[in-house]
C-alpha cells in the first residue's frame, strides 16, 4: 500500500478532521506531500502519533520522526517524503498554514484512498 494511503487511514482511524493534502512534488525538493489535520483534543493529537507510526511500520515503511511529541496543540510527523501536521482547532487557526500554502492546490483525499 502506498505510504500516503497508510497515513490517511491512520488519521481517519483516530477521527482527525479537516484533512488537507498538498502535492509538493513541484514545489519542494524535500518532500512530496504536506498534510494538515485537526484534532479535538491533545489526547487525540497524541493518538495520531502512535497510529501513524504503528501503521507505517506494519506496512513496511520506516518509523517517522516526530516534532512536538510533548505538545498538546501541534505535532509534526516527518515521514521523509510526507510531512503531517496535526493541530488542535485553535492552534490551526492561529498558525493558518493554509494561507501560506494558498497558491498550492490541495488534493481531494478521496482520490488518494
Q: Residue locations for each model-derived region?
A:
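Polybasic/polar functional segments that serve as interface/processing modules
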Residues: 1-29, 42-75, 89-92, 97-113
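Short amphipathic alpha-helical segments
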Residues: 31-33
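Short hydrophobic/aromatic beta-strand micro-patches
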Residues: 36-39
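Active-site beta-strand termini and strand-to-loop segments that position acidic
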Residues: 77-79
Amino acid at each position: 500500500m502506498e505510504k500516503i494511503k497508510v497515513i490517511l487511514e491512520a488519521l481517519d482511524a483516530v477521527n482527525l478532521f479537516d484533512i488537507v493534502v498538498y502535492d509538493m512534488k513541484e514545489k519542494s525538493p524535500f518532500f512530496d506531500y504536506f498534510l494538515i489535520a485537526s484534532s479535538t483534543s491533545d489526547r487525540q493529537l497524541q493518538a495520531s502519533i502512535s497510529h501513524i507510526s504503528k501503521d507505517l511500520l506494519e506496512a513496511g515503511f520506516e518509523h517517522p520522526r516526530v516534532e512536538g511529541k510533548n505538545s498538546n496543540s501541534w505535532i509534526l510527523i516527518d515521514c521523509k517524503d510526507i510531512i503531517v501536521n496535526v493541530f488542535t482547532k485553535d492552534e490551526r487557526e492561529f498558525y493558518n498554514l493554509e494561507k501560506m500554502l494558498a497558491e498550492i492546490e490541495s488534493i481531494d483525499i478521496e482520490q488518494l484512498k
